[in-house]
Amino acid sequence: MGIDIEKLYQKLYMRTKQDLEITKFIYNHYQEDGHIAWYYLSDENLKALQMSREQGSSYVNVLANFEEYSVWMAVTQNKKDNNYRVSIRSRGIPVNEVAALFHGGGHAYAAGATLQSLDELEELIEKLKEKINGKYI
C-alpha cells in the first residue's frame, strides 16, 4: 500500500488563490506596536474576501514567523453581536491572563478575547505590552 507522497505534499502545501488573496490582504494591512502585530478584518473586509469570521481568525499565524513579534493577533468584527473577536498568539508570553481581562481566556500562548469596541483594542495592546516588558526587563 504505502504513502502517496505526492498527495501528502499537496495536502500539506498546496493553497488556493483565495488563501493568497487573504494572506496578501493581511500583509498589506497588518499593524504593529513594539513586539505586537495584528490585523483587523471588518465585516466589509470579510465579505470582500469571501470568508467567515472564523476563517478570518484562523489566519492569525500568518504573522507568527517574524522574529520582531512575540505576540500576534487577529481582530475580526462581529456586527451582528456588536463586538470584536480577538485571537491572540504568542511566543513565550502568557497571553491568557490578559485575555481574561477582556471576556476571554485560553491557553498560555493561545487565547481569545471579546472587545465591545475598537477603543478597547488600545487597552488590550497596552496590557500585552506590560506583559512583554515584564519578560524582557
Features from the language model and the residues they span:
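Hydrophobic helix-and-loop "lid/oligomerization" segment in the mid-to-C-terminal part
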Residues: M1-I137
